[in-house]
């Protein structure tokens, strides 16, 4: 009798333990599934944002967004978009924000911004054997830029001192198209963020030179639509401030070979 009762007690205890474990796992899974999502619109702008060999989002902006969302209790969802449709997608609510090496300069009143979280140097690149040596040599030439970029604004609106009047400005949907235009001699030069242009040119196997003069410096931020959730923006801003203060932002950027003393202090590394 004692033996049967003992075996029954052990069996009941095991069943209760298993039930508790299943309950805990279920709660944990449910909690993870119920995390609010932050849908981030981005495009191919390596090393800031790109798709790796496994088809997963990667890059400096991706890593920063993942860590910021972890601290906020959000799940980041990265959506590769056509950059020239960014405002339509933002207004429709299909994406919550734009986070992809996006310049705040000249667009301060167009979006509700979080940032700047980083700074970037704007450069002009030419093929290695190009006769173009200085910014002034671009007068009457053709330049390719990424649509929506600081470079686009600069060359279309002549918003920076020392940038000459060029003959044509080709605004292309992503940086890979910009580099292709330069490589195939469709344009005389291309312009954009130094780190991104350098990375794309190297990956494309293009022999290139940067002109000695930088034509601008850009503040990079995360763009939300006007009238969007202010509490969400404040949470993101607080998370980024914490990451900067505790050195997390610097560690993420250093993993990509970035000189953080310059990009976090107002300039980009050479």
Where are the regions that the model predicts?
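Extended ligand-binding regions for polar small-molecule ligands
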Residues: 28, 59-71, 132, 136-150, ...
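Short glycine-rich His-centered loop
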Residues: 35-59
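Periplasmic-binding protein-like
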Residues: 43-44, 119-126, 202-241, 259-270
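Ligand-binding cleft/hinge of the Venus flytrap
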Residues: 50-53, 65-74, 151-172, 200-206, ...
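Short helix-initiation/N-cap motifs at beta->coil->alpha
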Residues: 62, 77-88, 169-184, 218
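Acidic, polar ligand-binding/catalytic clefts
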Residues: 66, 70, 75-137, 209-214
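A conserved helix-loop-strand patch within extracytoplasmic ligand-binding domains
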Residues: 74, 82, 115-165, 169, ...
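A ligand-binding cleft/hinge motif common to bilobed small-molecule-binding domains
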Residues: 85-88, 101-110, 154-157, 181-216
